[in-house]
A protein has these predicted regions:
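Domain-level signal for soluble alpha/beta catalytic cores
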Residues: 1-289
Length: 289
């Protein structure tokens, strides 16, 4: 994105953190290195290699650390694979607290198909110190997803939200939710005992001022609850708390046709085995080759 710019990435980050620290100083607030997606899809959906994404995020994080950032905030991610690259890069290049946030569509998934639960489990497992949901939708639409996010995590694990001010108006005159309506629609979030709440696209200082009043007497921390073992892919989530059906046919032992498919690179045959097991009710696939 900086192609053709006269400034280096490190210069822009240093200037941004310096400006943020000056603005935060009177309030004792923290300055975050706020990082979004790289703007290029990772393989196999795009052309960016996972290792290259890790390297690029590592460069960004190192620049933020050198500039004096107090924490790292990854937000508006829609690809769990890319968020994984970002979190690995942060853990490898700094000891700062890390917040991770994804943006979900109205159906409860990101545009790459990631579920709320898969995000929660993966981000926590990769070392994020807090997780949340931001952008795309307003408070009312995000609330059911925020509730699922909180339920997928231990009670003492920090959760936050940053909804939009609704949707942008077609005439370009702003967003369809006023500060007063935003504050009213944020009241149900009090029951989630959030670590933090804020606003994303379309929100202004007027929104945040009223939001502060909504949460002024709230304390973070949800009741403790038992956390079952879970398995997940970006698009599915399985709780292992009883009988879990595992498909084990993706295994060449004693299967001549499968062995032939492996030798010939016949991935269609192997994929058929996976699909047939899924359609038969398998919740998990054991790939043993």
């Amino acid at each position: 994105k900086l192609a053709g710019s006269e400034y280096a990435l490190e210069e822009i980050i240093a200037a941004g953190i310096a400006n943020c620290k000056r603005a935060c100083a009177p309030y004792g607030a923290l300055a975050a290195l706020d990082v979004g997606p790289l703007g290029e899809l990772l393989e196999p959906n795009g052309t960016l290699a996972f290792e290259d994404a890790v390297a690029e995020y590592g460069r960004i994080v190192r620049a933020g650390v050198a500039a004096g950032a107090d924490l790292v905030f990854f937000e508006t991610f829609t690809d769990l694979y890319e968020l994984k690259a970002a979190l690995l890069a942060a853990k490898e290049n700094c000891d700062l607290p890390i917040l991770a946030s994804m943006s979900f569509e109205a159906g409860g998934r990101t545009f790459t198909g990631c579920t709320v639960e898969s995000f929660a489990v993966t981000a926590r497992g990769l070392g994020a110190n807090a997780v949340g949901i931001n952008c795309s939708l307003g408070p009312k639409e995000i609330f059911p997803m925020a509730k699922r996010l909180a339920e997928a995590l231990p009670g003492d694990f920090p959760v936050f939200v940053k909804p939009n001010a609704g949707l942008p108006r077609a005439d370009g005159s702003g967003y369809d939710i006023t500060p007063q309506l935003f504050a009213m629609e944020m009241k149900p979030y009090r029951d989630l005992k959030l670590f933090a709440a804020g606003g994303c696209c379309g929100t202004t200082p007027d929104f945040i001022k009223l939001l502060n009043g909504v949460f002024a007497d709230c304390k973070p921390g949800r009741p403790a609850h038992a956390m079952p073992s879970v398995l997940c892919s970006p698009m599915d989530f399985v709780t292992v708390d009883g009988i879990t059906v595992v498909g084990e046919r993706i295994n060449p032992t004693g299967k001549k046709r499968f062995q032939q498919a492996l030798r010939e690179g016949d991935m269609n045959y192997i994929l058929e085995q996976a699909v047939s097991q899924s359609e038969a009710g398998a919740q998990v696939l054991d790939v043993n080759v």
